Amino acid sequence: MSKANLTHHFLIAAPELSDPRFEQALIYICRHDKHGALGLMINRPLEQSRVGKLLEDLDIEVTDAQVMEDLALEGGPMYPEVGFVLHTGQPEWASSFAISENVCITTSQDILKRIAAGQGVGHYQLCLGHASWGKKQLDQELANGDWLVCPADLNLLFDTPFEERWQIAADKIGVNFDYLSSDIGHA
């Protein structure tokens, strides 16, 4: 069992992970404590869900043209109707908390209005839904070899193309999936 706090780390889905919802997933852990964990998949763009269109559906006027092109992400299978804004900066919004020194998560509409206007938010990703684990569940999945752990960094979190994130995270920790054995504990 892991005693480490994995907040502000990435979970890299092992190739043998049996749950197809997480195949080649890269999950950013927003919270990990004795009660469980919450994370957001950051490498699954929703091709039919542009951030601008989602904001317009909420009756938020979009004046920043880039927002009309930005893709929302599938954050995970839990509560896919709920939006989570992962962003740089400080937790200055109505429903916001800091994950690390310069990464926050916000669920209130005030940040969406600022994003729509292209104001006050540096890097951001709008994720629909989240992944969560109950008490000790993530520890068990780690012990089973379902996930690999990688320290988070802002470049991978916000700037790396979505389709490259899973592999680049594995590369960061020196893992070549072509040579990774699924037979845990045996040489």
UniProtKB/Swiss-Prot annotation:
Signal peptide: none annotated. SUPFAM superfamilies: VC0467-like. One of its GO terms (cellular component) is cytosol. Pfam families: DUF179. HAMAP family: UPF0301. Belongs to the UPF0301 (AlgH) family. This is UPF0301 protein Psyc_0057. The lineage of its organism: Bacteria, Pseudomonadati, Pseudomonadota, Gammaproteobacteria, Moraxellales.
